[in-house]
């Protein structure tokens, strides 16, 4: 089974915020594939389907961003999954706005959701699809307000285009594209 974890925060106040781009990407993929989410006992909302003969599970952790690893670990344990079959969709302030980047391994880069996943899985070698938010000034209160802020109307066309590209990128991964192939096709 392929597991696609979109990272974000649960609650209407976080809907359409920059930090929730992972949720937005997994929602876009679900919509494109006529999938709907339901609650699970593994601290998440899940949607399941089969694409090209491959079982696929979309996951939105309900633990809040900074404890996403709890849901990842619970899902992998319950479904006897492995980090090799995981794709994490996550925001990245160090990427220019509107760019996407696949990364097969590495540190959390200061992202608490990724840090939680690494802590709970004991691994840094899971595939991530990072969505560029751009970076405001490096003052902590400005950064927090930026990531928890909603996308502007001017940003919406770029976000929609990025979500469309991510839907195709996720489909390519499900169909067996390797990390280097995905990087060559989608990293911008």
From Swiss-Prot:
Protein keywords: Cytoplasm, Hydrolase, RNA-binding, tRNA-binding
Record-annotated site: Stabilizes the basic form of H active site to accept a proton: 91
MF (Gene Ontology): peptidyl-tRNA hydrolase activity; tRNA binding
Subcellular location: Cytoplasm
InterPro entries (UniProt xref): Pept_tRNA_hydro, Pept_tRNA_hydro_CS, Pept_tRNA_hydro_sf
Residues the UniProt record annotates as site (Discriminates between blocked and unblocked aminoacyl-tRNA): 9
Active site, UniProt feature: 19 (proton acceptor)
Gene3D superfamilies for this protein: Peptidyl-tRNA hydrolase (3.40.50.1470)
Gene Ontology CC annotations of this record: cytoplasm
CDD domains, sorted: PTH (cd00462)
Keyword Kinase: no
Reaction catalysis annotation: an N-acyl-L-alpha-aminoacyl-tRNA + H2O = an N-acyl-L-amino acid + a tRNA + H(+)
GO biological process: protein quality control for misfolded or incompletely synthesized proteins; rescue of stalled ribosome
Binding sites annotated in the UniProt record for tRNA: 14, 64, 66, 112
SUPFAM superfamilies: Peptidyl-tRNA hydrolase-like
EC number: 3.1.1.29
NCBIfam families (UniProt xref): pth
Protein family per UniProt: Belongs to the PTH family.
Role of this protein: Hydrolyzes ribosome-free peptidyl-tRNAs (with 1 or more amino acids incorporated), which drop off the ribosome during protein synthesis, or as a result of ribosome stalling.
Subunit structure: Monomer.
Descriptive protein name: Peptidyl-tRNA hydrolase
Annotated source species: Leuconostoc mesenteroides subsp. mesenteroides (strain ATCC 8293 / DSM 20343 / BCRC 11652 / CCM 1803 / JCM 6124 / NCDO 523 / NBRC 100496 / NCIMB 8023 / NCTC 12954 / NRRL B-1118 / 37Y)
Gene from which the chain derives: pth
């Amino acid at each position: 089974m392929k597991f696609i974890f979109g990272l974000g925060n649960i609650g209407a106040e976080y809907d359409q915020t920059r930090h929730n781009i992972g949720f937005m990407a997994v929602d876009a993929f679900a919509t494109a594939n006529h999938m709907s989410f339901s609650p699970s006992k593994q601290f998440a909302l899940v949607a399941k389907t089969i694409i090209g003969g491959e079982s696929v599970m979309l996951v939105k952790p309900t633990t809040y961003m900074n404890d996403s690893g709890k849901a990842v670990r619970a899902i992998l344990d319950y479904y006897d999954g492995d980090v090799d079959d995981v794709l994490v969709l996550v925001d990245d302030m160090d990427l220019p706005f509107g760019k996407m980047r696949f990364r097969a391994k590495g540190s959390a880069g200061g992202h608490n959701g990724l840090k939680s996943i690494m802590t709970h899985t004991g691994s840094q070698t899971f595939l991530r699809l990072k969505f560029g938010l751009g970076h405001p000034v490096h003052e902590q209160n400005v950064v927090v307000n930026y990531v928890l802020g909603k996308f502007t109307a001017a940003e919406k066309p770029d976000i929609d285009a990025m979500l469309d590209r991510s839907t195709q990128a996720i489909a390519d991964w499900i169909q067996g594209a390797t990390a280097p192939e995905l990087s060559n096709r989608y990293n911008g």
